[in-house]
Amino acid sequence: MPTMKQLIRNTRQPIRNVTKSPALQGCPQRRGTCTRVYTITPKKPNSALRKVARVRLTSGFEITAYIPGIGHNLQEHSVVLVRGGRVKDLPGVRYHIVRGTLDAVGVKDRQQGRSKYGAKKPK
């Protein structure tokens, strides 16, 4: 417990809440350009080749974003929309690329959960 004198000298500081996606700067999504598209391996106990892209955002940040779904058409200089949301088994990946917008096409032949992957309703 601080004394009255200590509280007069320096007041109590409010607890600042830390954002989980600082590069978005409070926006729901941000546009960016892919600088590198590559695969990385997840941490233990999982095993795979997860597709990720290094993206330079309009806010000036350079981030690593996950490419969801099976198959993609992204390459260097592709313009993508990025949303928040981490990938639990990929350390440092705190963003997702939105499929079906800008240069990222939707997942082909997707039947369920189509809205999350930018897939149109099959005829």
UniProtKB/Swiss-Prot annotation:
Keywords: Chloroplast, Plastid, Ribonucleoprotein, Ribosomal protein, RNA-binding, rRNA-binding. It is found in: Plastid, Chloroplast. GO terms for biological process: translation. CDD domains: Ribosomal_S12 (cd03368). It holds the Pfam family Ribosom_S12_S23. GO terms for cellular component: chloroplast; small ribosomal subunit. The keyword Secreted does not apply. Belongs to the universal ribosomal protein uS12 family. Part of the 30S ribosomal subunit. NCBIfam families: rpsL_bact. This is Small ribosomal subunit protein uS12cz/uS12cy.
